[in-house]
Design a protein with these regions (language model features):
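Extended hydrophobic packing segments that form well-structured cores
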Residues: 366-411
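Short solvent-exposed loop/turn micro-motifs enriched in small/polar/acidic residues
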Residues: 12, 203-205, 258, 274-276, ...
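A short secondary-structure junction signal
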Residues: 109-111, 153-157, 233-235, 276-279, ...
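Active-site bordering "gate/hinge" segments
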Residues: 1-262, 393, 399, 409-411
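Dual-mode signal for accessory low-complexity, basic/Gly-rich regions
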Residues: 292-361
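Long, well-ordered mid-to-C-terminal structural blocks that present hydrophobic/aromatic surfaces
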Residues: 253-310
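Active-site lining segments that contact anionic ligands and/or coordinate catalytic metals
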Residues: 260-262, 278-280, 287-290, 313-317, ...
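Short linear motifs in exposed loops
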Residues: 223, 293-294, 404
Length: 411
């Protein structure tokens, strides 16, 4: 199968399953200029299913780097009105949003972390309408991968440029279940059904806590909210439309009780954040809050994440992914959270999910917070799963039920 045919299948999957574009709906795409082939393919498929308009916002990594090198720290506290209006206005128009995750993992290496954290915090505040409508399941959004040269060279450093780029595209296609024989949309419908048994079982247990332990030193107990819900695969929006926010996805996840986390967790894979790498780090929690942390690489970046606001010191997500997931079986370190988080159990600092508590999508931020769901301007996933990870569920009477053994589900 030619690259063009694979790209067409991938684009169709993104439009029909990732975003589930509805007739007369506007589609907004954000991508780097290197991803123009994928953007054009998605645009074509979106119009085929009846999109009203496809709006594309391109970025250039070299220009972005120059911006961070030359602007002052305080300049990153200001978001231009055109930028915030672009997101907020299209969100109010019930547009759906596609993000092509294609950046160089080290695009902003060496840049003062305060510049990065200031900009990300300012964007969250200025684009509050957009983020609120995404968080409360009003607008569909989807993040997908697109191979670019610098990212490919980081993942496959011993290959030529073309070999590395081809290899990364092949890994992206394989992770998205793109092959010669099958309709990818139907494969993802089957994938959706594969989550249901485990999600339903976890929701039936009435768990009070999760207990994690592995040989890296992780030993942590995480409380769950009274009305917790696990979710997995895709999500139902308020209007009943089902979409997959991430392609690929292998995770089953929930939002824990923000005030009930005790113990220490060690990372198992590098974290690529804001164009920087954070590696070999740990977080220690007491009463739900990070009280100590360290990192062999990227300490200041990690500190910037944790210090973003009050909620960035607490967990908003725990996600269960078997060690032998299809993504991990690729035996590739992607230096990209979208892919690496689906190869490993992970947790996230920052905001939790409204869909992870009963009735949550109809609650406002204050109500969710009172129910125990964390709130923050950030949501940063980090990988902590290992081949020997053990996870027990703890019931109300204190008894344990096995969830994970040797890195994989026991059911």
């Amino acid at each position: 199968m030619s690259f063009e045919t694979k790209l067409e299948k991938y684009a169709r999957l993104i439009v029909q399953s990732g975003l589930n574009v509805q007739e007369k709906q506007t589609v907004v795409i954000s991508a780097s200029i290197e991803s123009y082939q994928l953007v054009r393919a998605v645009t074509k498929q979106a119009y085929i299913v009846g999109a009203k308009e496809v709006v594309v916002h391109y970025s250039d990594e070299e220009v972005t780097r120059m911006k961070y090198e030359n602007m002052e720290v305080e300049d990153f506290n200001h978001v231009p009105t055109w930028f915030s209006s672009f997101r907020n206005d299209y969100a109010l128009m019930n547009a759906c949003f596609l993000y092509v995750d294609d950046e160089d993992p080290e695009m902003l290496a060496g840049i003062e972390p305060k510049k990065i954290s200031n900009w990300q915090r300012a964007v969250k505040k200025a684009c509050k309408t957009y983020f609120d409508l995404s968080d409360n399941m009003t607008n569909a959004w989807c993040i997908v991968g697109g191979a670019t040269q610098k990212w490919a060279n980081k993942v496959y450093p011993d290959m030529s440029n073309q070999e590395a780029l081809d290899s990364l595209w092949n890994a992206i296609f394989k992770a998205a279940k793109i092959d010669d024989e099958h309709d990818p949309v139907e494969l993802w419908n089957q994938h959706r059904r594969s989550f249901e048994k485990r999600v339903n079982y976890l929701n039936s247990l009435n768990l009070k806590k999760l207990y994690y332990k592995n040989s890296k030193g992780t030993e942590i107990t995480i409380g769950l909210n009274d009305d917790y819900l696990f979710a997995g695969g895709g999500s139902y929006l308020k209007n009943g439309v089902y979409n997959f926010p991430n392609i690929p996805t292998e995770e089953i996840f929930t939002s824990p009780n923000k005030d009930d986390v005790e113990g220490i967790v060690f990372s198992s894979l590098p974290l690529s954040y804001g164009g920087n790498i954070v590696d070999e780090f740990y977080l220690r929690f007491k009463d739900g809050q990070v009280i100590d942390f360290g990192a062999k690489e990227g300490y200041e970046v990690l500190k910037g994440i944790i210090d973003s606001d009050e909620g960035s010191k607490r967990l908003g997500e725990v996600a269960l992914i078997p060690y032998h997931s299809p993504i991990n079986e690729l035996k590739t370190l992607f230096y990209n959270t979208l892919y690496d988080e689906n190869a490993s159990c992970h947790m996230a600092l920052g905001i939790g999910f409204s869909e992870c508590i009963k009735g949550g999508i109809d609650m406002d931020k204050k109500e969710l917070f009172e129910k125990g769901v964390n709130d923050s301007l950030v949501h940063v996933d980090f990988m902590m799963g290992t081949e020997d990870l053990m996870i027990d569920g703890i019931l109300e009477d204190g008894s344990h039920v096995k969830i994970f053994e040797n890195g994989n589900f026991v059911f």
